[in-house]
Amino acid sequence: MGTPPVIAVVGPTGSGKSDLAVNLALELDGEVINADAMQFYRGMDIGTAKITPAERRGIPHHLLDILDVTQEASVSDFQDQARRLIGDIHSRGKRAILVGGSGLYVRAALDILEFPGTDPALRRRLEDDLAAHGTATLRARLQDVDPVSAERLSDDRRIIRALEVHELTGRPFSSFMPRREYFQPAVQVGLSVDRAALHERLAARVHAMVDSGLQAEVRRLDGLGLRTGKTACRALGYSQFLQVLDGSATVAEAAESTIVATRQFARRQLTWFRADPRITWIDWQDPDLVARAAGLCSQ
């Protein structure tokens, strides 16, 4: 037999991906690789709904708790680490199960995708340009060299990255976008959700996080440099509860804004994953969910 396909469990936040991944690992003798960028961070446990050791049920989980909150997550680094892990897991006769809602990270592990290099000095110059002239000026500059990216990108960091890539390579950033072509055989299982039910679940989950000590977790991480972390400080719940620590929001206000932001994030995740025709969708509340998913992964 050849190498088995990589399994990816995808879908919106709160849909039960982590639990399905564990059940598939138990069923298929697998190990789990985390593809949720915010779960890379040590100490970001409550707010990211990170799977606990007990919930892992003895299944090895990789790429959890690998970064300090001051470190920046890198899709390129993740691609290297995930592919090495996939090879190692397969070499031991086990199934590699990727799980997470960070769409680009999933694509980086599964698809043919190249990452242009970086230049810290160039990045700093572009950040200085942003501070001096504003987003509109940088977007206009990007429009001249890469109109596709200028139309698609709204986040300042990504606009800077697109300009950096163009200056480094002479190619538009959009030319590096991934093709829907697997790097090695893969099967993707998506959890299809009822949006109204998901919205209720996400609200309940945020309230449970608050009751479990999210504010204290954010306070502790703030002492470890959370605000200076370019990736970690943007995590859902953490940015909102930093405002509580600053006295600019109440706990109730931070919880409500976290619920709204989480629902918006779930919609963006669904839009991203629904665009991939290779994903097979199964209802998240299907009583035969594990058996159906295992069947797809065994074909």
Curated annotation (Swiss-Prot):
Superkingdom assignment: Bacteria
GO MF, one annotated term: ATP binding
Catalytic EC class: transferase
SUPFAM superfamilies: P-loop containing nucleoside triphosphate hydrolases (SSF52540)
Entry's family note: Belongs to the IPP transferase family.
Its job: Catalyzes the transfer of a dimethylallyl group onto the adenine at position 37 in tRNAs that read codons beginning with uridine, leading to the formation of N6-(dimethylallyl)adenosine (i(6)A).
HAMAP family in UniProt: IPP_trans
Entry protein name: tRNA dimethylallyltransferase
Species for this entry: Pseudarthrobacter chlorophenolicus (strain ATCC 700700 / DSM 12829 / CIP 107037 / JCM 12360 / KCTC 9906 / NCIMB 13794 / A6)
Lineage: Bacteria, Bacillati, Actinomycetota, Actinomycetes, Micrococcales
Gene name as annotated: miaA
